[in-house]
Amino acid sequence: MPVKRQSKVYYESDSDDDDDEFKELATLRKPISNRDNPLSLQFEIPASVQSVIHKIEESHIFRAKEEVIWRLTEIMSNVELIMTRYNIDSMSPGRKGSSSESQKKKRKAFLEKIATVMTNVDLRERTLSKILSWLEEWNLILSEVSAINMDDYYHWTVKMELIPDTLKRISKNVDSLIQMALLLVEEKKRAKKRILARGTLWKAWKDRAIKRPATAQALRLDQMIFDQIGLNAKVSEIQGMLQELIGTAMFSKLENTAIKYMSTTVINLSKALNTVSDELKLARALGVTLTPEQYKEDRISLTPLQAQVLGITLNLQQAKALGITLTPEQVKAQRVNLIPQQYQVHGTTLTTQQAEAQRTNLTPEQAKALGLPLIPPKPITFTREQTQALGITPTHQPITLTSEQVQALGITPTHQPITLTPEQAQALALILTTEQVKTQRINLSPDQTQALGITPTPQPITFTPEQTQALGITPTPQLITLTPEQAKALANTLTAEQVSLSPQQAEALGITPTPQPTTLTPEQAQALGITPTPQPITLTPEQVQALGITPNRESITLSPEQAQALGITPTPQPTTLTPEQTQALGITPTPQPITLTPEQAQALGITPTPQPITLTPEQTQALGITPTPQPITLTPEQAQALGITPTPQPITLTPEQTQALGITPTPQPITLTPEQAQALGITPTPQPITLTPEQAQALGITPTPQPITLTPEQAQALGITPTPQPITLTPEQTQALGITPTPQPITLTPEQAQALGITPTPQPITLTPEQVQALGITPTPQPITLTPEQAQALGITPTPQPITLTPEQAQALGITPTPQPITLTPEQTQALGITPTPQPITLTPEQAQALGITPTPQPITLTPELVQALGITPTPQPITLTPEQAQALGITPTPQPTTLSPEQAQALGITPTPQPITLTPEQAQALGITPTPQPTTLSPEQAQALGISLIPKQQEISLSPEQAQALGLTLTPQQAQVQKIYLTPQQAQALGITVSPEQAKAKGISLTPEEAHSLGIILTVEQAKAKRINLTPQQAQDLGLTLTPEQAQDLGISLIPKQEISFSPLQAQAMGLTLTPQQAQVQKIYLTPQQAQALGITVSPEQAKGISLTPEEAHSLGIILTVEQAKAQRINLTPQQAQDLGLTLTPEQAQDLGISLIPKQQEISFSPLQAQAMGLTLTPQQAQVQKIYLTPQQAQALGITVSPEQAKGISLTPEEAHSLGIILTVEQAKAQRINLTPQQAQDLGITLTPEQAQDLGISLIPKQQEISFSPLQAQAMGLTLTPQQAQVQKIYLTPQQAQALGITVSPEQAKGISLTPEEAHSLGIALTVEQAKAQRINLTPQQAQDLGLTLTPEQAQDLGIASTLKQAEAVGIIPTPTPEPYQERRLSLTSEQVQALRTSFPTKETLSLGIYLTPKQAQYLGITLTASQAKVMKICLTPEQAQALGITVTPKQAKARRTSLTPEQAQALGVILTPEQAQAHRITVTPEQAQALGIALTPEQAHALGIALTPEQAQAQDKPWTPTPVSSTREAKMIVSPTDQHPEDGYVVDVEAQRKNLVTLNQAAQTSALPAQYLTIAKNLIIELLHIDTVRLGYLSRKYVAYRLIQLARNHLTKRVKTIQNTGKGYEVQSLYTMLDRIDQYQKKVMHSWTDKQKQLEQRRKQCLRSMTQFFSQLERGYKLSLSQPMPSIPSFKKIPGFTKLQRPVLELLIDDSKRSDLFKTLGQASVEAVWNADLSTSSYPIIEKAPMSALWAQLGGYPDIPKLLQLDIQSTFRKSLASIRSQSKKIRK
């Protein structure tokens, strides 16, 4: 067995060590030899086995070497990367980040490669180890054989060698069977399709025939003639039915052809009938019968149908004599074969389709035998040498000279006609002649030519070699063409058509053939580097229309006289010279080829080659020839009619496509093989035989040398100067070059092209054989073509099959192939604006060039020989073959395939076998692959480390099958076989299985406290600590966890007063407590103070020391909380809590406990003796302490008088000092840092100097600046002074005190006092303008008027009074007129106006309204300014203050400042509120308030404002009210007016809005618009409210669950009682009744406890809501922070408007009134006390009004929400609950 490497880390092992290692492995793998094992028998290992072992060992060594080399390469690359990294870091520090990222990517790729290599190595080692183990076992088995028969051994060896071949043959046979089976299955599928297709055949016609049998009847004869519409409908229907037959694939191609024949015949019959009907109508309209002679005499032209209707039978001569024009259909009907000239003579117009229709080719002999007329022979073209050889004098062709050449030769050119465009002709008002119109060269479509009466010349059809090969046409090789006259002159017997001579015949006759130029295909030209000259492209009208090209209108030709008369200067045209002029000027003309007419050819004795004869489809049908269906080419019009989007080129359809589309193809010409022609009796024309040069040389035939075409480069290399050819430019090219062309293409000479900077494309040079021989060029031998006679003379038997030439042979023979079409992808066609069909669009090179498309050069594939010949060194690429490819190529692959990385495979273009690829999440994300989420299994530790909370579904309880059966579980057979059964905690709870803490701990179940409590699991402290569960004190209490302070600290519980008292189990038993087995085993038992109080356990002071209790709990438990306990537990006590607990604190203790020492926390100290002397009863604890502290209130209640010395150490509020009779001195206020308001200082009798007021932080406003008197003056005035006042130098009195004492304030004293207008008025002080100016009081005009101040404009300006013109006029101030219309006026106030301004204004409330006063005005009015208000320089007034001042508040001001006005405030202020303003300002208006404010509300506005209208109010509205559904939750809730609101009513909390509030608060904190402490308070309020809502829903659910569980047990007992009563066993009933009584008591106790919890939670919620409402309102006023506040909730049932008419009658509940008790009726009238006041939130889905299920619920306003159902009395049955609801509904209706 192979030895695996122990380490995969040390990759740096040397190759020698690896070689030694693998040599040792090889020795270990060798079988035990005979020397080592002398007991083994003599046995010879087969050579094949030895070779396999040898190859395995060699491959192993080879792979080991490769691995070592690869590792060394990786090490070197890593070293280079490290070096480059440090170089990069030292050279450019800025690129450090990118380099590190690249290093990370490379490192990741390197690690992935290592992982791939290791997996592959492991697989290889496993495979090799299996093979080697198999070989070793085989060797041992063979070595154990005792005796071997060598003959049998060799026999079986041969058989084993044959086994692979046998297996291969079996595999091939299996493959063939699979193919046969597939063919059979496909055949069955086809048969099935045929059966199915037959069932769906003619479905529409069958249905119509069943429903309306009359429509399935055939037309009558008269209907066919006169009803054209019906006839066309029937014909289209029959054609569609036939097309369905073709599309079913039930018929063969020949049968489909027959069906098409029937369809075509039906269509032709319909057309014929239509024509007959038209002619009948014409004959009836004429009503005149003429004889043929009359028609001839009157020269009346009749159609054949008209003649047939009149009974006249005409032939062609008669029709011509009578002037009757025959249509092509009529000519075909008479079986007349007309040539284009005959068509023109008869006036018949051929369409383009008719001209291009392919026809059957017959030889002249066949046509003569069939009696068919022959087309006259075509003219024959000769070259100059042929005409010289034949002695023919050619007619000299005219030579075209340019204007420069004419001018250079001094020739006076004849005036040429001038060409004008149609627009120019129209602008010059020329009347064109018929010849000028014809010479405009306008391209017309066939329809336009037919409409204009123009007969087009039929164009010949050109086929490419590929098309001829596809059509089976044998092209005639390049021969010499003679006219019949020339053939006759040469005395050769030829047919009536043109004659083709082979090169040998031409040489024998003395005719030298013209050398043919060689034509290259575009691919060959591209391969040779030749750029072809772009040729102009001609488009058909359909192509132009499809491409959206606007054709240029052709120009008009004018004669020189017309041009001169119009004053037009013609452009100089090239001059044409006659041969005589050229000879006179010494110009040598270029020889032109000579064209001979058939007569000239016949005169010269030349016999033309017979041409094939074209048969019409009727002739081929008459001869019984079946044409092969050819692909059909559709014109754009036909394609558009069939619903096909045509491409610019005609669309080529296969026969299958034409069958599928129901198109009848035009009969195509038929090509017959010699056998078919012989079978039909047709003698084919013998074809010439083509010989290769070798065959010709073998037969002794000397071929005529062919001319050679040289490229310009070759010609330049041989020193031949080619004749420069003229360049032809298209109009577009001339326009691009700035040349003004005539409408025709311009021909430039080489000199002109060179002058314009145009580089002409070099043209190939054609050399004659003589020139080739003179230049010493060896021409390529061309194949020789022999005529049948020459072949017969030489003894060569031609093959009767048609001869097919390859493109190379055609090129060698001088045949010019058509350039290959270009295929465009849909993207390219879309970019060019071409609408493609789903298939790629094929364009010819000319079309592609016209559209500006450059064809993509295709890659050239070179063979190794060509690569070597061209001197190209190919890059050696590693080739990877799959085992199948290697086996197909016969290559024996190495047992391990070579692994390529994806990049290498992509670079080599290899498509990898689709193996599953494993990607890391980063790779998947980089590739944009979304991985399928796989379930991940985590251990509890991993989940804890990842921060995942394991829910009970992920951690289950395991039971053995025996345990499950013992518990009464029914197991499935699969569960019974497994070792363990896993249950979730919920499943265990549902099955009644109790999960012990040990199971919960052992199984690692992470449960939330609520889940543990619901499952009945007692969560131990160790579990909570191990699972890192953070418990709140409430959760710990609910779960029954008793924690020590240390355990609580470990669990992260902040020790709040819900920590418990510890007892040992013995102490607990002594107290009478019943312990569980688990509690009996623990060392200590922990009880909460509440549990201890419920059990009647008295907590000792020592036990209380270790407990953190709230003051309320300590007070309720009777525990005296000491200062040390409060300090040790870090309890922050409020003064009220310290007072309630009886804690007496010194200032130091208060400071240590974090209590702010305000007067309620600093008390009066007494020693125990003093306290006993005062008659105080002391507790033992108080008797032990040194001092007893009493609050001032306690001292006052006990009747203890506080001396001034004791009062000095007490921080009292002014009210407390006043109530205790303590005179608070200024020093006490200063020492205690008490900020006193002026009112408090006055109440306490403290007189302050301005300096003292400044030290105490009192802002000296007019109420604090008082009148000073000396003690003597005060005694003289009759004032009684206290001893403290007698000692001071001055006594200060406020103006009010002075007024109360009857002291008159002199004006001098009043000058130093800052008084408000009200104070001055009450004191009897007349406020002068100087005082107002000295005090810097800014008065409004109204205040000045109320104070009775008469102000001049200057005084008003000094006082800062700014008023508008209207205000001045209202107050009575006459303003000084100024030019500025908007300038502020100066006002004068009277004493009455000043007196009316007696109002004090709180500043914070005025901020919401936006009524601003300047600081001077505020100081004058007695308003206290804060520092921030003084900075803003504006003061805000509340609506009440504005009303008292007579200031009118506009609705805009109220809207701009978001003032929330009550209806009373709005009415008092005179603000008229619209319903929109009321809704925008969140003002809730009752109907009475709306009526008092004069607001007319529509029902929609009332619904939006939360006003519930009565039916009478709703009917009083002008517009009928219809309730509309509301989308939002807040609008769906009906808001109750404040008058209907009760203090105990709740609020609706919008959860989403509160979450948005949190976001808003965070944003405000980021912008520093809100202080941190306010942010914390607001967040805590929101979080607490949301938590309370969640908890109370949980309370409700648990309460209901507990109730249902108790009811289930009670129902079970009730059933047992009924069952026992039937049996008569009374003693059992008594025990059951006892159990029922206990259950009822227990139910009351449980329900009472839950109700108490709900009440406590509801109190917390109401307190939180009130705090939130007040705090949010303060934030909105103070910081302009708009937060969503809780809304008042709806009453117990939804209030909806009463309906005047009900859609359905009210269904009474099925309750007998006689069975109801009077007590129940009286109780039913009262409102149902809700178990739960369910306030809806966003989390509970609101029930929007919809169609009610019953009239009762409709009367109640729809079904209530789920918590409403739980409000029903839980003690009553469901019928009783419904009865109470019904009584409530009656109350609502009343």
Curated annotation (Swiss-Prot):
Q: Show the Pfam families listed in the entry.
A: FAM186A-B_C, FAM186A-B_N, FAM186A_PQQAQ
What InterPro entries does the entry give? FAM186A_B_C, FAM186A_B_N, FAM186A_PQQAQ
Top-rank taxon of the source lineage equals: Eukaryota
Leader peptide range in chain numbering = none
Q: Which family does it belong to?
A: Belongs to the FAM186 family.
Q: What is this protein called?
A: Protein FAM186A
Supply the source organism for this entry: Mus musculus
Lineage, top ranks: Eukaryota, Metazoa, Chordata, Craniata, Vertebrata
